[in-house]
């Protein structure tokens, strides 16, 4: 006899297993820079490095990259001279990041790890960064709280994201076009494009999933609710412009199915400094 399990009856452990499987599969096709030339890819890296130079200053810092994926942030921060630790649930993503780092002769500390339960002691990082991560976390408030735990007093957390474009509530835009695109991609690239996307059960259990209105605003609120100070969101104009250019170069089969938001934003927050430490704290100064 078949037993039906509702969305809320699927355990977090089972959901996390499905999420890991999804990212292991997606790792094979995750990097869109395969569709662009080195000129624009180099501009993207330089733009993000310029942002971090302004934010972090010239001091060598110990940085945790949560959800490192194929290593976009980890690699460029290591190239800037920082000590970088990257964690990800997906072993395949970690493997790809490690391969890229070796090709560039960079030393990264890469580990399989959960954004909600950082495998490090309290107050051991100067900075925590994440890029396109919070939307895919089952318990984002738990994750952000743990990021704050591993930060040193006065340290900063950065969450980079592109706020979702609200889809019109019609069948064509919400269902038909994405599924048509996945069909075309599957045929053209000889793979199962559906395997890279979350099923309905997972999507319903992700509080900050892009399908849910106001998910970006809730990210900011969670930073405040979890105790971060000086929380602010900043639009990254140059990174956004380059993102728009890259999307314009994407194959038509990808543009067919999705409305892309090119606008990169950074949510930042600081961990409070203990009163006795304030006079000697100079984080991010050149």
Identify what each model region corresponds to.
Residues 209-227:
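Short alpha-helix
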Residues 226, 248-286:
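Core SAM-dependent methyltransferase catalytic element
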Residues 64-66, 70-117:
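Class I SAM-dependent methyltransferase SAM/SAH-binding core
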Residues 141-153:
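A short glycine-rich, Lys/Arg-flanked "PGG" loop and its adjoining helix->strand segment in the class I
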Residues 127-140:
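A short SAM/SAH-binding and catalytic strip from SAM-dependent methyltransferases
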Residues 2-58, 72-76, 96, 156-190, 234-237, ...:
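Conserved class I S-adenosyl-L-methionine
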Residues 116-127:
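A short acidic, Gly/Pro-enriched loop at the edge of an enzyme's catalytic core
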